[in-house]
Amino acid sequence: MKVGVEAIRELRQITGAGLGDCKEALETCSGDMEKAKVYLREKGLSKAYKKSHRDAADGLVAVRVEGDKGAILKLGSETDFVARNEKFRSLAAELVSSLLKHGAEDLSSFSASPYDGGSGVSVADEVVNAAAVLGEHIVLSGIGFLELGGPGVIGSYIHGAVGEGIGRAGALVALEATTAKTEALLEFARQLAMHIVAAKPESVSVETLSNDIVEREREIVAKQVEALGKPESVASKIVDGRMQKFFEDMVLLEQTFIMDGSTKIRDLLHNKGQDLGCEVRIVAYRLFSVG
């Protein structure tokens, strides 16, 4: 089948593969973008195995932390012009404050909850009202709410800030630590949130990474290694080695800390625990970005 130039360019942007390879992949996969990505991975032409955290054309991420609770959300817009609008920024700030105050299990329940801005409508209706005023489609596309169940801290970070707690990307991370909240622990949590924004992990640990993701990657790697024509014993070791590199990219505890370029996050937690005289553990994190 014939595929459009825009689809080829989009696939190239996602995968980093050449235009010709992207065209071949899309034609082979009948224009299916997801299948084309897998096709390129199997050919060893792409490393784009991470899902995107950037599904809005534009917009803002808003974060708020207060005590043992933290909230984060992504408010999408069609253009940067609207994302920079004061009403849009105010809406993002009001929504994340409401999320922090009331909490929510998921996007659906939060959207159905009353809007705190005094208009007497639901969160979803207020977003629709804002879209009518601003003149383009606006969507509340993701939320995250973390609350500590014991001693610890919640850290946050905003990248590309355009206001307090509002920017182009953001993360929350909850740390469990059996010690008093100190400036050192809070700063450590902030640094971890900064790392999460930059490194974009898919899970905290190997055990919590989706089995479907792991098995799909193992199948792709096995096909890549099979093409090398190595003996089975050698091929098996190559597959294991490539899977370890996969985990080091996808899993937070296996990643290398961006601020020193050498220490694994799991070792960083151990070292910080020794400094503080207690165990420090990552309970959960939330990450969003736009643009």
Curated annotation (Swiss-Prot):
Record's keyword annotation contains Protein biosynthesis: yes
Coiled-coil spans in chain: none
Keyword presence, Protein biosynthesis: yes
Matching InterPro entries: EF-Ts_dimer_sf, Transl_elong_EFTs/EF1B, Transl_elong_EFTs/EF1B_dimer, Transl_elong_Ts_CS, UBA-like_sf
GO cellular component, one term: cytoplasm
Pfam family, one: EF_TS
GO molecular function per UniProt: translation elongation factor activity
Involved in Mg(2+) ion dislocation from EF-Tu, as annotated region: 79-82
Keyword annotations from UniProtKB, A to Z: Cytoplasm, Elongation factor, Protein biosynthesis
PROSITE patterns named in the record: EF_TS_1 (PS01126)
Cellular compartment(s): Cytoplasm
Function according to Swiss-Prot or TrEMBL: Associates with the EF-Tu.GDP complex and induces the exchange of GDP to GTP. It remains bound to the aminoacyl-tRNA.EF-Tu.GTP complex up to the GTP hydrolysis stage on the ribosome.
UniProt cross-references to NCBIfam families, sorted A to Z: tsf (TIGR00116)
Family statement drawn from the similarity comment of this UniProt entry: Belongs to the EF-Ts family.
Name used for this protein in its record: Elongation factor Ts
Organism listed in the record: Anaplasma marginale (strain Florida)
Upper taxonomic lineage: Bacteria, Pseudomonadati, Pseudomonadota, Alphaproteobacteria, Rickettsiales
